[in-house]
Amino acid sequence: MSAVMTPAEFNDYKVADISLAAWGRRETIIAESEMPALMGLRRKYAGDQPLKGAKILGCIHMTIQTAVLIETLVALGAEVRWSSCNIFSTQDQAAAAIAAAGIPVFAWKGETEEEYEWCIEQTILKDGQPWDANMILDDGGDLTEIIHKKYPAMLDKIHGVTEETTTGVHRLLDMLAKGELKIPAINVNDSVTKSKNDNKYGCRHSLNDAIKRGTDHLLSGKQALVIGYGDVGKGSAQSLRQEGMIVKVTEVDPICAMQACMDGFELVSPFIDGENDGTEASIDKALLGKIDLIVTTTGNVNVCDSNMLKALKKRAVVCNIGHFDNEIDTAFMRKNWAWEEVKPQVHKIHRTGPGSFDAQNDDYLILLAEGRLVNLGNATGHPSRIMDGSFANQVLAQIFLFEQKYADLAPAKKSERLTVEVLPKKLDEEVALEMVRGFGGVVTKLTKTQADYIGVTVEGPFKPDAYRY
């Protein structure tokens, strides 16, 4: 898409600077060339218009790659309204390009918490009234939660939600268990072409980039502690190892802990004998006193707590590549220590008490992105080729749910369909095949004899649902 409209013709948006649209358009065109799966779906399904009639509320990082996602949804027939799921992650040129194309978007880099909530509200509302949306595309679950709590009547017309992240999936499963979830959900996060690409390979690329942009530090030879060794933690540990860091890992899951050991990382705990009793006495101060960089990757709360922050080496860098800013106890830091802004999304946290500080003091931590997503706060996030798989999954998930027409079902049928499910493996394989073609790769085809021997069809799916890639 390349249409550019003037603000006089269209004003259903709020971005930092609409004059950045031409820049955003140039970057979007480049991103399209690096997103073969998404563009392949656009070409494959444009004639059928499978999303014609879909009205999608979207809340996901408003980046250049998201611009390609949005315009793919529109090209397949959808109408959308958009906001960002993070106050620091918007690329203003991307938001401007989408607004200039006549698509409602409310996002800018550096929103306050109040502005963030206002932007989500503007996504939900059109001309001051709830939009007649019938689909949700979410990242982290804030949009889904707001609609359930503040606009429950809208749920009668909504066919479902597709969720991008681990954090959002946890929230959906919690809502389902409590009987609070009113629409079916597709767990995009656990599609193989999302979790292995975005969570693992994406973090491998973007974590070290963000730290270096934020600090200008040489990382080689320094000690890092990665908290968590799920897919995000695996990619993060590799990212730091690539820089020549001495990487240690902490984990609560024995299986992930075993994987860290097998991958050659030292498994440690910031707590003596691995037990956190909530006091400074349980902290392994000898360990944390040598750590130059700590990265949280878990999607859990206070995994880098106040006692750990007190024990960290002077001038250590602290950052998060999970979803929310509560992985690091930033609330404690705000209440008890002085913050000095070095530049946007980079703060010296003086551990000498609240209020004023001595600029020459050397007892400080360097906090990146205020504890929010470091790769989008201090850099530009994952490459287009990585996000290609995630967003192709989102498109197929939106088509899948929209075709199911949950909102039109009889009540008895609705209760059967109220689930949180992973995208069918056949669609996961479709995304992977488009990505392979983008690399110029050639996939070998099974013969009929070979397919029969392992109990699959020649066209796939090629693995049982229980297979772990």
From Swiss-Prot:
One of its GO terms (molecular function) is adenosylhomocysteinase activity. Substrate binds at T63, D139, E164, K194, D198. It holds the Pfam family AdoHcyase_NAD. Signal peptide: none annotated. The keyword Nucleotide-binding does not apply. This is Adenosylhomocysteinase. Belongs to the adenosylhomocysteinase family. CDD domains: SAHH. GO terms for cellular component: cytosol. Binds 1 NAD(+) per subunit. Its main location: cytoplasm. Its cofactor is NAD(+). It comes from the Bacteria. Its EC number is 3.13.2.1. GO terms for biological process: L-homocysteine biosynthetic process; one-carbon metabolic process; S-adenosylmethionine cycle. It comes from Pseudomonas syringae pv. syringae (strain B728a). It is found in: Cytoplasm. It catalyses: S-adenosyl-L-homocysteine + H2O = L-homocysteine + adenosine. May play a key role in the regulation of the intracellular concentration of adenosylhomocysteine. Pathway: Amino-acid biosynthesis; L-homocysteine biosynthesis; L-homocysteine from S-adenosyl-L-homocysteine: step 1/1. NAD(+) binds at residues 165-167, 199, 228-233, 251, 300, 321-323, 375. It is an enzyme of class 3 (hydrolase). InterPro entries: Adenosylhomocyst_ase-like_sf (IPR042172), Adenosylhomocysteinase-like (IPR000043), Ado_hCys_hydrolase_NAD-bd (IPR015878), NAD(P)-bd_dom_sf (IPR036291), S-Ado-L-homoCys_hydrolase_CS (IPR020082). The gene is ahcY. Keywords: Cytoplasm, Hydrolase, NAD, One-carbon metabolism.
